[in-house]
């Protein structure tokens, strides 16, 4: 839609000059106004309203809308007014309509406007035919000029206040009625009367405009006074607020400083207490560490003394284990400076004539002792403080330890059962072996220190036995000194509990 870009009076004058319909579209910010504006911008509407239409678009919040609503009440927004030449609305569209409906309304307004135009033309022809004198043909021109002046006077007050608009509208209506009667005007009123009335109306309009300007000036003065008063009050209020805010900030700052000082004092006191406590704890720790160090030194000295004594005892005693060809063994202690012959004699007394004449040898390192070695000391032969020697029967090689049986069956059984018997004897001798009794009174005196050494050795062997027993505990069950294999029922028996009266509780 091609909207008129000037003010309402200019749009009215343009419509009057071209004899077109004056269209006023009052729009707002709501959705219906947007839809109606879209309908006005439609291509069909543009084509239908391209001729004989002068359209203007005003906003509901503008001053032009307020002035327009004083003459034509705006019932709803959006609204579209189609106003004819006489100022009478030909059509009013309230709300939003579609583009097709708007095109229909525009065609209807065009028909109404064309009918009114034809009626006015016929009236003019009849009036001209009824006039016969030259003066009568002159007076309509005067009336037309008066009518044009009156229309200008009616158009100018639209920019003024509503009261002057209504008053001027009444006068304009009277003059319009006079101007619409050209024959009566030529017969009843002379041209001078019309000029006087126009001058009088112009003077009244000027007076009212002057009054309005004075009222506007007074209102502006009052507004300025109110504005200055309000500004002063606002400045006073802001100054008071700033003073109160500054006062509160100073109080808050003072309170924070006091709290900080108190917090620093508390922290200093706590630091002093912590230092004193730490110093006391450090002193106690030092004393405890000194006591522990003294006790540790005493224990170390005692252990050193015990170690030296045990070393001396071990250096004076040689513990010899004799291993027999059948896998069994026995142990005895000898003085470290005793000759090897004494150990051989002890073995011969213990074994008897089972193996006949035999010799002694070590397996690690492999060494078979000769007759010269029997005269040497055990310490010199590196058999102190402990050693393991093997009895080798005479006439057998050193590698042959187990004697062969005469029968094949016994040989086979011996071969199969020998590892198990050897393991059993080794375990039994290791766990339950006791030193053999002294066989001579002369040897009893020499074996007394050796017994004490063997007891110390057995004490050292106790942890080893405990570890072996702990390892066996998973697969064996101990009942006194007897071990037997575990079964599934043993685990259930161990989980049973017993109450106070010796009855079993599952």
Curated annotation (Swiss-Prot):
Keyword Endoplasmic reticulum in annotation: yes
Free-text comment on this protein's domains from its UniProt entry: The UBX domain is required for interaction with VCP.
Q: Which domain of life is it from?
A: Eukaryota
Modified positions (Phosphothreonine) are: 487
Where is the segment annotated Interaction with UBQLN1? 1-199
| Pfam families given in the database record | UBX, UBX7_N
The name this protein goes by in its record? UBX domain-containing protein 4
**Low complexity: bias regions:** 444-456
What membrane topology does this protein have? Peripheral membrane protein
A single GO BP term for this record reads:
ERAD pathway
Instruction: Outline what the protein does.
Output: Involved in endoplasmic reticulum-associated protein degradation (ERAD). Acts as a platform to recruit both UBQLN1 and VCP to the ER during ERAD.
In what ranges is there compositional bias, type Polar residues?
A: 114-136, 177-189, 496-506
What organism does the record attribute this protein to? Rattus norvegicus
